[in-house]
Amino acid sequence: MRTLHPAYRVTDLATSLAFYGAIGFEQVGRVDLGDGVTLTMLKFPADEVVTLELVHRPADGPVVIGSGFSHLAVQVDDLGGMIEAVTKAGLSAGQVERPGGLDGPQTSWLRDPDGYRIELVQWPPGHAYGITAADFSGTGDHLARERGTRGNTKRR
């Protein structure tokens, strides 16, 4: 089995498409389900498959995020360049953090138009794509705390 993609409900499809386009997503396809309901499939240029679905149901009203969803993490090759690009697009990214110390990843956070949190992650050179079991084997790793809660969490 494999994870396919998350689906975010969005309030304003055009605004959301502009936001996700600014961080590098491209539209793969769109399905019109009638009554203004659309499913828009996005991916990054290097991805082979859809990695994010935007669900627009205008009759449902504005999106309310709630407390069940934390964030979407996006791997970037050049965090500084990405922050510069999103700033030029009128978006606001948080300052660069190094949650795992100097040997860990660099991260920055931003929010999409509906309030979904996006974590931008630049891994150190030589790190595998994404989080692996090796990230849990050392001390002081970057996964020890969940951003947004300000509290520390322990791994099991």
Please annotate each region the language model reported:
Residues 45, 55-57, 123:
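Generic beta-structure capping elements
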Residues 52-53, 119:
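Conserved beta-strand in the GNAT
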Residues 47-52, 64:
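Arg/Lys-rich, alpha-helical DNA-contact motif
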Residues 48, 60-61, 126:
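Active-site/binding-pocket entry motifs
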Residues 34-35, 62-64, 102:
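Short glycine/serine/proline-enriched coil/turn segments at secondary-structure junctions
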Residues 8-49:
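Core segments of cupin and vicinal oxygen chelate
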Residues 2-12, 30, 40-43, 61-156, ...:
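Vicinal oxygen chelate
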